[in-house]
């Protein structure tokens, strides 16, 4: 009996065990069904089409230049005026991020200015490279159409497209884990010890740029160690494997001691409370089965689509079908590549050190193997269908069509609504018109970012949209080359406008504001005060989350003698804790 697509792959029985293990990924279909599937050249053309579609989808998302949304702003506000050394300190707005990612983002800002494009450049480049690298890895792990399914899922998955154009470290988490996976797979095929040296040399970069990279590195190291034990690895392989693990441990200790400990000490309690629902209930083990089921049927497996509240149930079913095939055929290497990193992740979550589930961003490091597992599950589903007389050719075409429609739908949505929320779009539109317009007619100063005046202190310590306001201001200052307020130019015809942002959820320090106004009145006459209200709405653009206000205080000289500009250094000291 022939496998219905084994003949489509280039795998030969004389190749390594990794290649031979891909034979079982096919199904048991007859020769007639085998002939009904696309030939090898057609599969290659389809694979190239999906890769190019993935590049196009990511490029469109990046080019559309979505407004920064709140989660991006919380992190990006730290790149406005912090130095590289200051990024080693606790970050503002309860943020934690690996230091090498912070430094690369800061370097991009210094090179290209503070803008949406520069802030998202590193994730975008990482994502494009990942597409081609994943295609290579998938071809090493899977045969024929399974390769196509894996690459297609990876190319059209919403999380992969989204994090290609988002100024957060989750796209680089996936990229670095994929690089490690690629090196392990190449080592297993060729048994070249130098690849283990490459893994060792990668550890300082990977663990310094990605927190979950330690899960991938640790899990893959366990897989390589088990292979060396089972196959009696050479002395050189053992030496290089030990060297890899030594650099892994040293890199983790150094980066944690330098940055991780500082961030954890500052934000550990807040993050633990914020993500407490995403830690497994190890003290209530009777709840664990339901928790695991719901977690994996929700955000953790949101590929190519999915989300909270069981929205990823179909993906979970495909993954379970794939796991069933892996277990039935005793493909322990495959199981190790997937379950090793995820198992360490789960252990960290059980210790309440890193959330498991709750959002797809936390499983980005595992996305390559999840997409491969989904492909195996699709293979199993098509094999089951073929046993009941369904045409393999039609099933294959149906799967490819569905995946293409998913990708096309995502691109269409981005083109129609190039923003995360309408409130984000309105906030950026206001910044673009307000800051440029006022700078032409007046001397303008943002009280917080330009002068370091903080009259609503809580909004700059908590997760508020003040970060959004400050980032949009910094973007417009750089984009339009707006200069700081020059008090020597203030006159009756060119007044001084002082701008204050406030979030209605946080209390205004009225006494401090009145004191500042009294001080300003000694030198200037307050000729107007206007407050522009903005409703901050939820993603559905219906539910009111809070009211935001942009207050403007307009002054003209009282006696014609301008005062000195307040020291700029106060801004960074006030923003940083």
Regions found by a protein language model. Give the residues of each.
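Membrane-proximal helix-loop-helix interfaces that form the catalytic/acceptor-binding platform
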Residues: 24-27, 31, 39, 43-386, ...
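Short, intrinsically disordered terminal tails adjacent to the first/last structured region
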Residues: 1-41, 566-577
């Amino acid at each position: 009996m022939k496998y219905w697509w084994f003949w489509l792959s280039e795998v030969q029985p004389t190749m390594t065990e990794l290649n031979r293990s891909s034979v079982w990924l096919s199904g048991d279909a007859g020769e007639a069904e085998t002939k009904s599937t696309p030939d090898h050249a057609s599969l290659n053309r389809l694979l190239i089409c999906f890769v190019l579609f993935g590049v196009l989808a990511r490029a469109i998302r990046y080019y559309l230049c979505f407004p920064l949304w709140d989660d991006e702003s919380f992190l990006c506000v730290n790149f406005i005026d912090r130095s590289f050394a200051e990024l080693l300190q606790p970050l503002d707005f309860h943020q934690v991020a690996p230091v090498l990612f912070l430094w690369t983002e800061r370097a991009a800002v210094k090179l290209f200015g503070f803008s949406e494009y520069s802030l998202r450049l590193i994730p975008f480049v990482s994502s494009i490279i990942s597409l081609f690298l994943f295609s290579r890895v998938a071809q090493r792990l899977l045969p024929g159409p399974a390769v196509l399914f894996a690459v297609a899922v990876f190319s059209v998955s919403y999380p992969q497209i989204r994090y290609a154009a988002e100024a957060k470290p989750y796209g680089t988490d996936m990229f670095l884990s994929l690089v490690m996976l690629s090196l392990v797979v190449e080592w297993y095929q060729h048994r070249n010890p130098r690849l283990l040296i490459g893994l060792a040399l990668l550890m300082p970069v990977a663990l310094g740029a990605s927190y979950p990279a330690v899960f991938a590195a640790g899990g893959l190291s366990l897989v390589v160690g088990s292979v060396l034990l089972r196959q009696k690895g050479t002395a050189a392989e053992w030496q290089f494997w030990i060297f890899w693990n030594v650099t892994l441990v040293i890199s983790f200790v150094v980066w944690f001691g330098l940055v991780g400990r500082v961030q954890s000490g500052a934000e550990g309690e807040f993050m633990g409370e914020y993500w407490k629902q995403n830690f497994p209930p190890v003290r209530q083990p009777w709840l664990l089965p339901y928790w695991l089921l719901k977690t994996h049927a929700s955000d953790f497996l949101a590929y190519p689509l999915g989300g909270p509240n069981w929205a990823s149930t179909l993906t979970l079913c495909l993954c379970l079908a794939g796991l069933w095939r892996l277990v039935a055929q005793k493909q322990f290497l495959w199981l190790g590549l997937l379950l090793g990193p995820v198992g360490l992740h789960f252990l960290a979550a059980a210790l309440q050190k890193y959330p498991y589930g709750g959002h797809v961003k936390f499983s980005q490091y595992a996305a390559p193997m999840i997409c491969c597992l989904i492909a195996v599950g699709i293979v199993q589903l098509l094999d089951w269908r073929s046993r009941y007389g369904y045409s393999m050719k039609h099933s294959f075409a149906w799967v490819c069509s569905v995946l293409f429609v998913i990708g096309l739908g995502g691109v269409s949505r981005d083109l129609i609504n190039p923003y995360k929320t309408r409130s984000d779009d309105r906030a950026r539109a206001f910044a673009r018109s307000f800051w440029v317009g006022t700078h032409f007619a007046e001397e303008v100063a943002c009280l917080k970012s330009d002068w370091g005046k903080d009259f609503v202190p809580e909004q700059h310590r908590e997760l508020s949209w003040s970060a959004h306001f400050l980032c949009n201001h910094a973007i417009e200052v750089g984009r339009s080359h707006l200069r700081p307020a020059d008090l020597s130019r203030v006159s009756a015809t060119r007044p001084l406008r002082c701008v204050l942002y406030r979030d209605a959820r946080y209390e205004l320090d009225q006494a401090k504001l009145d004191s500042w106004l009294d001080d300003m009145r000694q030198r200037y006459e307050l000729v107007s005060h206007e407050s522009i209200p903005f409703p901050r709405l939820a993603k559905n653009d219906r539910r009111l989350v809070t009211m935001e206000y942009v207050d403007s205080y307009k002054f003209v000289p009282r006696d014609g003698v301008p005062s000195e500009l307040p020291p700029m250094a106060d801004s960074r000291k006030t923003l940083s804790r």
